[in-house]
Amino acid sequence: MPEPQIFGTHEPKTLEQLRDVASRADRAALMADGHLGYVMPIGGVAAYRSQVSVVGVGFDIACGNAAIRTDLTRAQLPPHLRELADAIQETISFGVGRKNQADDAPTDHPLFEDSAWEAVPDRHERDRLRAKARSQLGTVGSGNHYVDVFADDTDRIWVGVHFGSRGFGFGVAHGFLALGQNRAWGERVPERETLLDVTSPVGDAYWQLMNLAGRYAYAGREWVARKVVELLGGREQELVHNHHNFAWREEHGGEPFYVVRKGATPAFPGQKGFVGGSMGDDAVIIRGVASDSAEVRDLQARALYSTVHGAGRVMSRTAAAGKRTRRGKVTKPGAISREMMLAWVKEKGVVLRGGGADESPHVYRRLPEVLAAQGPTVEVLHVLHPLVVVMAGAEEFDPYKD
């Protein structure tokens, strides 16, 4: 196998984790926003001939970003952005296990009748999982998931969202993690590498449900983003939408592969993507470069046509926010205080609702630096400046934050 393509600089443990993944994959790469993950580093990309990694795709299957460019300008926004932030917080459901309470919640979406549901091996589990998915479609969750309102350099307003397939994807991941270790669906098993042969019955079932979770995540992000555009009184002019925790069938060097991206954005020449920074930093709309340069094309190929999915964490959640009990009692203080976080976003002029110290801008790299480390493989089309950021509250207990 070729040596993995590594962008940027990384902690030794992150590189060790990449080498471990690469020892089982046919090709591998690590993006500049990479950091230590579960089994596979965040920012990692791995290509397999006939396998897919359940842990590589991850527990939040199809986590990704969607951005809508509206017909509005900054001058057309309400004069008090705090009221807009409150309206988003009241309209969209944030947090672990939350249900979509909106009158027009998409509970009748066609994906709930998809034949892929039959791939869940147990009827009781299938019904339970589908019911949960139905109730959560169009909810955002917690952790680093968000709804943002941006203005670009021309003062055009964008709405951006980041989240995945919610409890549905989590249930699929845990179910197949067990099946892949020869245990029953629902049993608790170690979070270790679990490679499924896509041509096997279990691998085929996972592939079907992973793709269904991908459709589910797309539907949820589009519903939320369009709901916020509706709140703004605007109209959609462009949608940029991508997963960054997923597996795809792709051709590389004329050969077919199953490509797993764990916290990495697809960036084929001409393909657009939406990449966030932090609650107090700019985001970007990027596009894979279509270059005449053989050197650039070779670098893109070695990156498996991938780029960063964000700025990249440099401080763990526990180091940043400390440890708390489920009731919120601090058992170990963290390095980042809420006051530090609020001072940063205030200086940037951002109206923030929710968010915790574990998501403060202090815990991330700066996005321009990681984009520069990717070299000439992608180009920035729009820089998006955050005006309103809405997330789950700091008090939200989530044992699965990653």
Stretches found by the model and what they are:
Residues 1-16, 23-30, 38-42, 46, ...:
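Domain-length cofactor-binding catalytic modules of enzymes
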Residues 50-71:
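N-terminal cap/recognition module
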Residues 103-112:
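Acidic, glycine-rich loop-and-strand cores that form catalytic or ligand-binding grooves
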